[in-house]
Amino acid sequence: MIRILQMAVILLSVPMIVIAFYSHPSVDDYGYGSSVHLWIQEHGYHVFGIIKCAAEFAYEYYFKWASSYLDSFTGALMPENFGCYWISALMIYFLLTGGMLYLFQSMAVSLGGKEYRWIGTVCALTGIVAVTQNWPSSAEALYWFDGAQSYMGYHAVSLWMCSALVMYMFCGDKKRSIRLLVVSCVLVFLAGGGNNVTSFMDVLICCFFLGCAVLLKKKWGIVFPLIVSIAGFLLELLAPGTAVRGGGDYN
């Protein structure tokens, strides 16, 4: 069964990977990537300068238009600025499928033990086939960088976040629990910076795990990812750019 599903995923992935090499920038890609593009033309490929330029662009957009505190930053680093637009689709695809695989395996191992890892693998591969063959628009999901990274990219980060939270809830080693808690907080912050929907979902997910902690009467450290998720959501909700995009005034 696993081999059949593995072959199905590989065969179904080939066309999507090939198409990635024919994708090209469009619409918001130019708006978000223009500042870094101009900086590279003037100063060349200097890593810290490019990061600084992208951060300045994100800061400006946070107050003027886009409330997401990380989306504008990653959008400014459009791969076409570096001559490799095709890599964006591959990064998002493997980040998403890897997140699904890791999440289901984490659940299977945490609930049943390592001997049940294969169940998680089967569920993940089945889910990957279902998702990749049924999304409304593969162009927006993978091949349009700005839209894909804003939604699918940060959704994929949420999957990795859920994996870390699952492993934390079932981890019996204190030191490993602390490491998983730190990783969870980092991933919660990153996932929440993509868009309002993902940010709010992260709050709900952390609330669910807090409910599990209440039932189990342990793992109260889950409060820290919850606090981070709420802080991230408020960063987006209360951003000046939110009022601008929603029709408010900006002075």
Locate each region found by the language model:
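Start-transfer (signal-anchor) and selected internal transmembrane alpha helices
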Residues: 1-16, 117-120
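Membrane-interface micro-motifs in multi-pass membrane enzymes
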Residues: 118-169, 195
